[in-house]
Amino acid sequence: MLSLRHIRRFCHFPSSAATGIAYVSTESNQIQGLKPLEEPALVKLKSERDPEKLYNLFKANATNRLVIENRFAFEDTVSRLAGAGRLDFIEDLLEHQKTLPQGRREGFIVRIIMLYGKAGMTKQALDTFFNMDLYGCKRSVKSFNAALQVLSFNPDLHTIWEFLHDAPSKYGIDIDAVSFNIAIKSFCELGILDGAYMAMREMEKSGLTPDVVTYTTLISALYKHERCVIGNGLWNLMVLKGCKPNLTTFNVRIQFLVNRRRAWDANDLLLLMPKLQVEPDSITYNMVIKGFFLARFPDMAERVYTAMHGKGYKPNLKIYQTMIHYLCKAGNFDLAYTMCKDCMRKKWYPNLDTVEMLLKGLVKKGQLDQAKSIMELVHRRVPPFRSKQLLSLKSIL
């Protein structure tokens, strides 16, 4: 049972909704020995747009394992019914599913709980957890975490704490690291950082070891709320405890360093990552490139971009956007022009402000042909820029 006496004093329960981390395990939709879903049924479920007809079609296949065990068909149906506001149809379908043989499998019930949660039907999700024994289904920490995950979508955090405090002892469930991480994420989303830290301490008192998700969640929230000293301390504690940072952790730290205009430190982390068998991604490179531009080292930003190419990475739209935008700000319109052409030929377009800045720079340098070339590519954009935007760009020429 989770002790919350230390945590509660940090909680002020604002009305904004908390968002949890999707840690909930669901069973695989790979069913051994089953043939693929027959095309006619799949096509009908996928293409049906009328909510009532969709409901009837799925209801007609309620006992067809090829349908109900297909995760996409199940979740897509519920999602579209929720989008149409037909929560009554969703409840009827899911309640019926619970009475069938699959309702005795916890993995299937976890899916039902999460589907209710994603549809905003919190009460039904909790009732599903509370009434599992009525269908002959045993509870474990997996279904507990599913219900906790759904509660983390709900603004009533009093309910979350009551559930955390009462449900484990009532149902004989030993909560795990995932349970704590969901709670910690909820605290962080609400800005209750002292409560989040105390939850981590309670985690350790319970004999559980904080993992990389725990540390990353806390470090990210601390940096976001300008509590940098504590964030740095947690980074050091994580390393001392032998918990290896993952890609997300590195990106959180690099973003913090970039925001502080510590581009060289961010670059050092980028270089350290491969040595720890953590490969940077496009987000990592984009942040370091932007960091050097912001710190007024455009040459280093270009070097990082070139090094990224050398390692086999290809720029995406965000990296193109960063490079073109800041190259223009640095007055390097020649390279910005070349990169903008490459970007647009791939059907990727920088934002309007960046294109406008590039055109003005080219015209000012007397490179009218290059500016016209960019405008030709602008006209090929799909969907096109609005007429008013196009007129604004043309006026530059």
Swiss-Prot record:
PPR repeats lie at residues 105-139, 140-170, 176-210, 211-245, 246-280, 281-315, 316-350, 351-381. Gene3D superfamilies: Tetratricopeptide repeat domain. Keywords: Mitochondrion, Repeat, Transit peptide. Pfam families: PPR (PF01535), PPR_1 (PF12854), PPR_2 (PF13041). InterPro entries: Pentatricopeptide_rpt, PPR-containing_protein, TPR-like_helical_dom_sf. One of its GO terms (cellular component) is mitochondrion. The keyword Transcription does not apply. It is found in: Mitochondrion. It comes from the Eukaryota. Residues 1-81 form a transit peptide. Its main location: mitochondrion. Belongs to the PPR family. P subfamily. This is Pentatricopeptide repeat-containing protein At1g80150, mitochondrial. It comes from Arabidopsis thaliana.
